[in-house]
């Protein structure tokens, strides 16, 4: 009796159940795959190519279906390098979009776009997974209440407050403290809100990703001894990855964040560094798929792609995802379609200033350039709004007087202007504060300052109550009581020296 090969061979029986196609064409990171008639995969389905290259090395490439071409062919974008692939190789249709691990098992770990751990710390529990392509929450699920997301960082909470479930753009060059600010926010959301964070490294330098991981371990944001106590999950798709991976890594990070929001009902911080690279990767893929380019060579689907990512970042009645996105501005041109499309989605901008960093004022957030749609009396209340406006006016006047001071000196100013300058310098220093994550380097303990304390402190400085105190007393302290205590200590020290 002859044995039926299709039932005896386990490999064949698996393929019978799964949809099987063959590679018809390879154009860099884009594959055309032919399937049997009537067995076409859906758009966004994951396809897996397994086999061996000419040297006998194992190949395992995952792709995502982007177009149905007709003649039983689909065009797919690879999520990893396509070296070693050949025409005629078997391709398995997984029957669903890419799915990644979600939940507590992801904390303290580094993943790639496919949700595979890349930190050499062993496998991750994959019993709970979620597809990366989803619709945004329905209107009925959204939380429409406007509320401030308190960060415990004075300059942010007072002058450019974040919205709970909002989107914030983080602008700043190299070396002005972007990473430290990101780490402090991750630390504070865990302590004050019982929340977790997800960091999506989209198309940035591998070295920076590694540095961030090392710094997080050093500062305790990632707990190596007990990973479950870590406060962040990391997802990296760096510069050396194919455009498909860079285009989808933001969605992988967002999917992990959505689980914490919808199932664990937590407040989540989602960091995307850098949102421009997401657009850039989409532009590369668009050209490879043969779409006609739009303005400045960008993809014609730019607004749609950006919208499908940004609309999933929101507050629901269960929890919230507050997103902080680093924005690279090509050639400092804010009218470029990529940053211009991003701005349409932002609720607040935090601008880091090299001038403040050079003065040693950290966080180096520019109080005059940073903006927020939340800074309105009906949202934050009259007291907060008035205090913020007075702080900005005082700092603006100081900025205008700086040229005169540089040429003629302080003595040539009127009495009123001299008082404004003295208060502005105190405000500038009081906007600095010691960070928890920088304790390891500075030796001074970090401070979390509540919004009410922040407003009280600045009101007292503006009222002139502390005009007699030295400005040094306001530098790197938490609330105003610490500034007065520091002033007393400075006075004692100067008396002892005499």
Swiss-Prot record:
It comes from the Eukaryota. ATP binds at residues 172-179. CDD domains: ATP-synt_F1_beta_C, ATP-synt_F1_beta_N, F1-ATPase_beta_CD. The modification Phosphothreonine is found at residue 6. GO terms for cellular component: chloroplast thylakoid membrane; mitochondrion; proton-transporting ATP synthase complex. It catalyses: ATP + H2O + 4 H(+)(in) = ADP + phosphate + 5 H(+)(out). It holds the Pfam family ATP-synt_ab. Its main location: plastid. GO terms for molecular function: ATP binding; ATP hydrolysis activity; proton-transporting ATP synthase activity, rotational mechanism. It is found in: Plastid, Chloroplast thylakoid membrane. Its EC number is 7.1.2.2. It is a peripheral membrane protein. Keywords: ATP synthesis, ATP-binding, CF(1), Chloroplast, Hydrogen ion transport, Ion transport, Membrane, Nucleotide-binding, Phosphoprotein, Plastid, Thylakoid, Translocase, Transport. GO terms for biological process: proton motive force-driven mitochondrial ATP synthesis. The modification Phosphoserine is found at residue 13. Produces ATP from ADP in the presence of a proton gradient across the membrane. The catalytic sites are hosted primarily by the beta subunits. Belongs to the ATPase alpha/beta chains family. F-type ATPases have 2 components, CF(1) - the catalytic core - and CF(0) - the membrane proton channel. CF(1) has five subunits: alpha(3), beta(3), gamma(1), delta(1), epsilon(1). CF(0) has four main subunits: a(1), b(1), b'(1) and c(9-12). This is ATP synthase subunit beta, chloroplastic. It comes from Draba nemorosa (Woodland whitlowgrass).
């Amino acid at each position: 009796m002859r044995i039926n090969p299709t039932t005896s061979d386990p490999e064949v029986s698996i393929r019978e159940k799964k949809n099987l196609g063959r590679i018809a064409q390879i154009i860099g990171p884009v594959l055309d795959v032919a399937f049997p008639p009537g067995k076409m995969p859906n758009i966004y389905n994951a396809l897996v190519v397994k086999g061996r290259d000419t040297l006998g090395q194992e190949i395992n490439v995952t792709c995502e279906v982007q177009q149905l071409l007709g003649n039983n062919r689909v065009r797919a974008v690879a999520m990893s390098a396509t070296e070693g692939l050949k025409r005629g190789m078997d391709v398995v249709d997984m029957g669903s979009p890419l799915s990644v691990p979600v939940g507590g098992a992801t904390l303290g770990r580094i993943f790639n776009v496919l949700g595979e751990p890349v930190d050499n710390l062993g496998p991750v529990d994959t019993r709970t997974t979620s597809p990366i392509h989803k619709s945004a929450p329905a209107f009925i699920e959204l939380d429409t209440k406007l509320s401030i997301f308190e960060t415990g960082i004075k300059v942010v909470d007072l002058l450019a407050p974040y919205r709970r479930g909002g989107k914030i753009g983080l602008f700043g060059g190299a070396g002005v403290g972007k990473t430290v600010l990101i780490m402090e926010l991750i630390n504070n959301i865990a302590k004050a809100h019982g929340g977790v964070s997800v960091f999506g490294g989209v198309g940035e330098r591998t070295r920076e990703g590694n540095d961030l991981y090392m710094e997080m371990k050093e500062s305790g944001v990632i707990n190596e001894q007990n990973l479950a106590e870590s406060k962040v999950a990391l997802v990296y798709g760096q510069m050396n990855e194919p455009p498909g991976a860079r285009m989808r890594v933001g969605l992988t990070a967002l999917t992990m964040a959505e689980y914490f929001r919808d199932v664990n009902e937590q407040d989540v911080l989602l960091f995307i560094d850098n949102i421009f690279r997401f657009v850039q990767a989409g532009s590369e893929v668009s050209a490879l798929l043969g779409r006609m380019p739009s303005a400045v060579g960008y993809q014609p689907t730019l607004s749609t792609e950006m919208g499908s990512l940004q609309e999933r970042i929101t507050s629901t009645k269960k929890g919230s995802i507050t997103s902080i996105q680093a924005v690279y501005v090509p050639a400092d041109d804010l009218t470029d379609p990529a940053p211009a499309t991003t701005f349409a989605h932002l609720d607040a901008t935090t601008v880091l200033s090299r001038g403040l960093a050079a003065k040693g004022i950290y966080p180096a957030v520019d109080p005059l350039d940073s903006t927020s749609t939340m800074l309105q009396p009906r949202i934050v209340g009259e007291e907060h709004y008035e205090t913020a406006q007075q702080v900005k006016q005082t700092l603006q006047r100081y900025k205008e007087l700086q040229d005169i001071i540089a040429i003629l000196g302080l003595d040539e100013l009127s009495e009123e202007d001299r008082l404004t300058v003295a208060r502005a310098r105190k405000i500038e220093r009081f906007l600095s504060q010691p960070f928890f994550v920088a304790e390891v380097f500075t030796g001074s303990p970090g401070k979390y300052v509540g919004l009410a304390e922040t407003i009280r402190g600045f009101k007292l400085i503006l009222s002139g109550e502390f005009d007699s105190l030295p400005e040094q007393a306001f530098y790197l302290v938490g609330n105003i009581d610490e500034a007065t205590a520091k002033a007393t200590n400075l006075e004692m020290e100067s008396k002892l020296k005499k």
